[in-house]
Amino acid sequence: MATLAQQKIRIRLKAFDRRLLDTSCEKIVDTANRTDATAIGPIPLPTKRRIYCVLRSPHVDKDSREHFETRTHRRIIDIYQPSSKTIDALMKLDLPAGVEIEVKL
């Protein structure tokens, strides 16, 4: 079993708004650095584009269509040598509602 000094915490973040995602990444990295852990990142991952094609008219006109898209921005942050203070500070961190967070130990 690995000790706390050899462990790594990997945090994956997803959001539709890039600015909201970047501010959340800054908060996590600042919190990790304040508790004497080593934070590497945020590492940007490829942005996923999802395009939806919708008919403009509710009736016959099939030639008239409209396209909508959603972009999902993703980041990874690795935290090396976390202490119990680091984990407690990350648990108490208040992040915006539009950011999905996945934590792996």
Curated annotation (Swiss-Prot):
The keyword DNA repair does not apply. The keyword Ribosomal protein applies. Keywords: Ribonucleoprotein, Ribosomal protein. PROSITE patterns: RIBOSOMAL_S10. SMART domains: Ribosomal_S10 (SM01403). GO terms for molecular function: structural constituent of ribosome; tRNA binding. It holds the Pfam family Ribosomal_S10. InterPro entries: Ribosomal_uS10 (IPR001848), Ribosomal_uS10_CS (IPR018268), Ribosomal_uS10_dom (IPR027486), Ribosomal_uS10_dom_sf (IPR036838). Disulfide bonds: none annotated. One of its GO terms (cellular component) is ribosome. GO terms for biological process: translation. Belongs to the universal ribosomal protein uS10 family. Part of the 30S ribosomal subunit. NCBIfam families: PRK00596.1, rpsJ_bact. Involved in the binding of tRNA to the ribosomes. This is Small ribosomal subunit protein uS10. The lineage of its organism: Bacteria, Bacillati, Cyanobacteriota, Cyanophyceae, Oscillatoriophycideae.
